[in-house]
């Protein structure tokens, strides 16, 4: 069951971006408190605010759009059911990614699959680029993708959360469930290994 299936209500103009009629932004914490009280509108607002980021994170882990959609459905269903258990030790967005990571890895284990993150390194093409620049971007993207795929799952995980999700060390530790010092150590070796791979491929990391 997806989030859209179990929450069907009309949303007033301006609510999907999390703003009240007075133009004030409703905090994630407040939304969670309202969800815990059974507020479906708050659930829709939280979903609209975070589902794209959580979906992209899940997609990088499972490499399949249908599976990523399944993960999203499970994540927000868990939020709906377990909002009252949120302890606010970390940001709501960190909690969402932690649940998404657990759900994605559980799904892959159930299917007996191993996912390689091939999409995270894909360069975003700029319409303003001339053909030569566009070709260079694609070449660099392909090299980065190949090097990325050679990293260990732990190192890909760390780089994804720090660079693509822009999470701080403390948030990464919370999501993965490891000490902050371990995050720092993995980050050091992940960057070192990626730099070595890129250099070996003829592209120094800048």
Task: Put a short name on every predicted segment.
Residues 1-33, 37, 45, 49, ...:
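Intrinsic, short, N-terminal disordered tails of RNA polymerase sigma-factor systems
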Residues 75, 99, 159, 172-173, ...:
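Hydrophobic positions on the alpha-helical face of helix-turn-helix-like DNA-binding modules
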Residues 81-88, 98-118, 137, 189:
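Arg/Lys-rich amphipathic alpha helix in sigma70-family domain 2
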Residues 31, 47-48, 55, 65-82, ...:
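Conserved RNAP core-binding helix
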Residues 50, 186-189:
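Residues within the DNA-recognition helix of helix-turn-helix
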Residues 36-37, 60-65, 73-91, 110-111, ...:
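Sigma70-family region 2
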Residues 108, 187, 194, 198:
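DNA major-groove recognition helix of helix-turn-helix
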Residues 56, 70-77, 90-102:
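Structural recognition of an alpha-helix C-terminal capping motif at a helix-to-coil junction
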């Amino acid at each position: 069951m997806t989030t859209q299936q179990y929450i069907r209500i009309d949303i007033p103009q301006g609510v999907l971006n999390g703003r009240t009629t007075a133009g004030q932004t409703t905090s994630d914490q407040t939304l969670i408190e309202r969800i815990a009280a059974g507020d479906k509108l708050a659930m829709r607002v939280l979903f609209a605010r975070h589902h794209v980021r959580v979906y992209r994170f899940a997609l990088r882990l499972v490499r399949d759009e249908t599976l990523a959609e399944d993960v999203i459905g499970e994540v927000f269903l868990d939020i709906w059911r377990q909002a009252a258990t949120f302890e606010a030790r970390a940001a709501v967005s960190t909690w969402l990614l932690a649940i998404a990571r657990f759900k994605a890895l559980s799904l892959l284990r159930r299917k007996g699959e191993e996912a390689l993150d091939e999409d995270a390194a894909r360069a975003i093409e700029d319409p303003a680029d001339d053909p030569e620049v566009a070709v260079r971007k694609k070449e660099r993207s392909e090299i980065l993708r190949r090097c990325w795929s050679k990293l260990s799952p732990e190192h890909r995980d760390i780089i994804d959360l720090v660079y693509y999700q822009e999470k701080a060390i403390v948030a990464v530790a919370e999501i993965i469930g490891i000490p902050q010092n371990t995050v720092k150590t993995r980050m050091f070796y992940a960057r070192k290994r990626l730099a070595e791979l890129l250099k070996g491929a003829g592209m120094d990391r800048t």
